[in-house]
Amino acid sequence: MLNQGIILNIQRFTLHDGPGIRTEIFLKGCPLRCDWCGNPESFKRGIEIGVYHNKCISIEHCGSCLEVCPENKMLIYSDAMLQQIDRQQCTGCLSCVDECPSEAIKQWGDYMSVDDCMTVIRKDRGFYDRSGGGVTISGGEPLLQSDFVYELFKACKQEGIHTCLESSLYVNWNRIEKVLPYTDLFISDIKLMDSTLHKQHTGVDNRKILKNIKLLVELDQELILRIPVIPSINDDDTNIEATADFIKNELNNRVSVLQLLSFMRLGEEKYESLGLPYKMKTLSFERYEFQARVNGIADYFNQRGIHCLVETKEQSKAEHAEYKQNKTSRGR
């Protein structure tokens, strides 16, 4: 149905993905598999089950999941503790989720209608009005559910609510074009400029993404670009210089702001709960030196005339100055 989406989460009072105080709706499903992604529960579009084995209180003291599972042979135990599920045999009935008293089994994703979402959104209308905020739809890749995004943003605009779409832009243009009339602001990433490296670290090449970014700029669409800065993957001079050249020469520097998001090691427990490998587990780096590198990258972009912030808000400039001061002090 056009007015239903598979929702991963709704967060109220968010501050970083668009102006003001916002309600952020995360949709399930993503065509990318970024090595550094902290939200593996967003990969698949359908509803999934995560297993947190450290929360299991054992078959001996509980066993509720075994009692309700129609295919209990899919439950994988070790020392009487639930470890994982056989996802090939799981029917997705979610009975185990409802019965587990310790929340060792978690449901990722649920169906919600536009009306359901608007009920949540309207609760914070006063905060949007006072702060210049609104609604942000993110993912996953929300444009995999472009019909739902269209209907929800249309409902928001009918009530005068600011809308922001955070998207990888790795979709066909018709999906973007569909939501344009009701989207005030786009947020997207430039992860790597080299298409081969982009595919190596995200699973897809970047040609469609860069093309769609250029099309949005040509339409004078308000656009925030971000670089998730990942040590030893995209923080090298070659990639940074190529990104600056693209923004200056291909986009004519027509972006609202470029934001640098420093890598944080997040989501490892969620990967384990879904039976997926966490590719950044062995990545080793020194946090202070890496953050100094990120600040240096921001300096480079600003010197090139590209308005660049470390993280997402103007107050990050103060943090940036503090890092520079500390770096100078350490060098004395």
Residue ranges of predicted features:
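Iron-sulfur cluster-binding cysteine motifs and their immediate structural context
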Residues: D35-S42, G63-Q84, S95-D110
